[in-house]
């Protein structure tokens, strides 16, 4: 085989290679990974593709063992970039329905949007979910929900089960109906006469 033919074959073979991640360097700028095709060959450090890298940016580092493809211009694998996310031994599909988007994580957490059911479910086995908009913040933990805001308006019937503590003034424009005792400064006010 001539040199030109051998080079041509090498370029074709290197253009797209099925491979998996064998190393990740998150401290590099930009972060990089090394991939292997399962033989003794291991790539140089290469960048990986993300969902978005412009004004909107997405971050997810590929996992060790994650399968994907190395795309190399002119078959030069040293110039390749890795496209992660090929289902296989390292990670089976998290779902198989055509009307959902699903993220599942190793700790048991998940993000599931089902546009047929019009449902978005965030599941954490433990920890914290925080939503911040300017100075307003909602924090959900294993055993509490904390809301911080300048004003909270509720336009609905509100049902509360359990004790209620109010640390501040209370202003009411309608009636107050109570089936139990009404205490004022430690004294029952139920039968107070004017």
What does each model-identified segment do?
Residues 1-119:
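Exposed beta-strand/loop interface patches that mediate assembly or binding
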Residues 126-194:
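Intrinsic low-complexity, repeat-rich intrinsically disordered segments enriched
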């Amino acid at each position: 085989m001539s040199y030109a033919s051998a080079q041509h074959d090498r370029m074709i073979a290197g253009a797209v290679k099925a491979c998996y991640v064998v190393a990740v360097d998150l401290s590099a700028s930009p972060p990089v990974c090394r991939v292997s095709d399962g033989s003794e060959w291991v790539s140089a450090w290469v960048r990986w593709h993300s969902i978005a890298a412009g004004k909107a940016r997405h971050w997810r580092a590929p996992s060790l063992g994650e399968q994907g493809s190395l795309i190399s211009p002119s078959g030069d694998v040293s110039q390749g970039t890795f496209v992660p996310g090929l289902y296989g031994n390292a990670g089976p599909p998290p779902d198989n329905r055509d009307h959902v988007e699903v993220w599942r994580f190793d700790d048991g957490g998940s993000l599931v949007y089902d546009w047929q059911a019009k449902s978005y479910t965030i599941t954490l086995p433990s920890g914290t979910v925080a939503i911040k908009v300017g100075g307003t913040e909602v924090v959900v933990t294993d055993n509490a929900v904390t809301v911080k805001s300048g004003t909270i308006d509720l336009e609905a019937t509100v049902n509360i089960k359990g004790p209620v503590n109010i640390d501040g003034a209370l202003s009411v424009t309608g009636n107050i109906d109570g089936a139990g005792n009404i205490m004022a400064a430690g004294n029952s006010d139920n039968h107070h006469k004017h």
